[in-house]
Amino acid sequence: NGYDRYNFTFRNTTSFLGDKLKLDVGASYVMQKDRNMTNQGTYNNPLVGAYVYPRGNDWADIEMYERYDPARRLYTQYWPVGDAGMTMQNPYWINYRNLRENNKDRYMLNAALSYDVLDWLNVSGRLRIDNSNNDYTEKFYASTFTQLTEGSKNGLYGITKTKDKQVYGDVLVNINKTFGEDWSLQANAGASISDMRYDAMKVRGPIPDGEITDEKPLLANVFSVQNLSNTSKTKRLQEGWREQTQSIFASVEIGFKNTYFLTLTGRNDWPSQLAGEHSVKSSFFYPSVGASVVLSQLIPEMPKNLSYVKLRASYA
């Protein structure tokens, strides 16, 4: 098997207007390739054949995992042990002739902008994009165990292309202010949007060998969509989905003498799953209320091993 991954990252933080305006941007790109990652179970697992291979047999004999077949005019799997009812194959054949390859490209972009309107008032916004493209291929060469190739002796080919797109953005107003020596106010209010999309196209099927169907045999070990069976044994699938959630939210906490606190929060979501004509409601709201008291501020002399005690109750 093999695994390669390369990461490229960029980030820059800048301040303007006497440090009142701050901009933070970043970008990442990930390129990943892997082949024949470890597989559990018996299918496509070289460890099964390696474990049960008779100790008295010459291991070097199966290292030459394929032999030329004059009748078929191609190289076929050499595995004198047989499948033993366990779908076993030559471990080397699995590694080099049952190829499962994955190529993934992913890029992530993010930006955050923050502005201090006053010393107690801040406005900020964030945007994050995370997109990835993935290509997964299966190439099972001729003479692979037919249970893995939909019954064909000429092999199997499959390709799956997927795209994932995620976008998230929010805006937020933050307040942190004191009134005299006793009262304090911490509050924030904002809105956010989350959008996710997924698209996939998949084609997977056997290369006709003239036996499993009435089709004429096609070239073995030619891995292309045009070389696959036109029967129901070839699976062709296109699917995708999209979901989006729009939200508004706010929270307020009022403090007195840094001892007593009252907290109120509320959030309303509009998920796309509830946007259908048969939905009873298109959104849902969930509030909460809480109160707390710092007992350690009220107790004159706290024990040395106990410096902070807080009692809190909330309802949501």
Residue ranges and their predicted role:
Residues 5-9, 267, 288, 310-312:
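Short, cationic motifs built from Arg/Lys/His that form the positively charged side of catalytic pockets
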Residues 243-247, 254-259:
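Short, flexible loop/turn motifs enriched in small residues
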Residues 269-271:
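Active-site beta-loop-alpha junctions of metal-dependent nucleic acid enzymes
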Residues 277, 284-288:
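Outer-membrane beta-barrel domain signature, especially the mid-to-C-terminal portions
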